[in-house]
Amino acid sequence: MLDVIFREYDIRGLYGKELNEKSVKAIGFCLGQTMLNKGCKNVSVGYDARYSANELFNYLVSGLNKAGIKIYDIGLVPTPLGYFSLYEGLKFDANVMITGSHNPKDYNGFKITINKESFFGVELKEFSKEVYKHLDDDIEENLEVEKYDILSLYVKFMCEQFSFLKDFNYKFGVDCTNGAAGVVIEPLIKALNLKAHVMFAEPDGQFSNHAPDPTEEENLSAIREFLNQNQDYSLAFAFDGDADRMVALSKTHVFCGDELCYLFAKNIPNPRILGEVKCSKNLFDEVAKFGTIFMGKTGHSNIKKMMKEKDIDLAAEVSGHIFFKHRYFGYDDGIYAFLRALELVYKGFDLESMIRALPKLYTTPEIKISVNEEEKFKLVEEFQKEIEKGALKGVKSLCEIDGARIDFGDGWALLRASNTSPYLITRFEATSLERAKELESMVFTLFDDIKARFKN
């Protein structure tokens, strides 16, 4: 039953079912041992606004204490503040954030960083075997921690980094989605004396106003309505549940992560940029005119790894994860990205006009295909083989860095396996909507043939 909680990038499951006293105490104990074995002397632990956070914190801390590692409680804070705690202040050796990110309210999980490296992939799978061995251990409640105020340190750091924004006479909206963002946004806005209309700042684990995923159009309706009703507000920002993602929107446009990446790149000298495999052709074509750009795998852990390997200044996912190494520490931080977006406005960048000036491309929404967990990677491999054999007309090139991204010259198609769920994910982009739909039809016809063969 616990197999499902150990994902590619983190640990995630239903509170009370997969994430219960027995499993979380065992996770804490095994994590403490792993951290000690990697030379860590301490760990910071924080959590988001979910109703299950306190109980999971107690279970996790009890396990960590049994392992014998020093624990610092950084409280209810966004995930980026957990990462930040490894770089500033006491500069902790490891961090665990208890967060369900953008998932429904009954979910929760753990994002783990050890010695500034994401704990994921093969290591996390091997770790799961250790957890199984200790599921029946008698781990007593031990809540011994030392409190640490990372929030004040973070706000002070941001105020110093963005001191030029103080008293900036520009009105904008912010939707904190009743997640963890509000605990930072409110003191930050106050300290910089910014003219912001802040919505849903109160942390509420029930997410009473809307779900904590700003990439879903329905979750932007409240902040969009505010923009439309107030002529002197032209831009707004929305965060996900743990504020490692940010979406910007105007009265007429939602800026996706790849569009934001392009805008940010224009403000970096000779930039080295990384875009995930789902990013628009515009990002790769346009950045190549003034910088260097790479394509990489989806997933925050994969991106952080490649950023180090390629000395990347800035990376992005379409979903709103923005990673700044330029003037920052190289992890995804929605609040930092929000401040960098305000910086663009402060410098006179017209964000909407800059995006409108790009070549017009038509992108389909992400389509998920439900498949068996055991078959998903095999199906993608078979699809890649068929492309290599010439199964589709007009193929210019095939990129297999993460699934199959097929370039047709006037558009591209993507089929990749989700690393976290039993789905294949598709995306299509072309110079016309008709062509994008045509590519979609071609890919689905081929995939249906492959899937039928698997059943026989």
Regions found by a protein language model. Give the residues of each.
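An N-terminal, well-structured beta->alpha segment
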Residues: 1-67, 144-170
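Gly/Ser/Thr-enriched, mixed-charge loops and adjacent short helices
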Residues: 108-229
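Phosphate-binding and adjacent anionic-ligand microenvironments
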Residues: 270-427, 433-456
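Glycine-rich phosphate-binding loop
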Residues: 92-105, 227-254, 294, 300-333
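Short glycine-rich phosphate-binding loop at a beta-alpha junction
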Residues: 40-48, 171-173, 272-277, 313
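N-terminal small/polar loop signature for handling phosphorylated ligands or for N-terminal nucleophile
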Residues: 42-107, 188-248
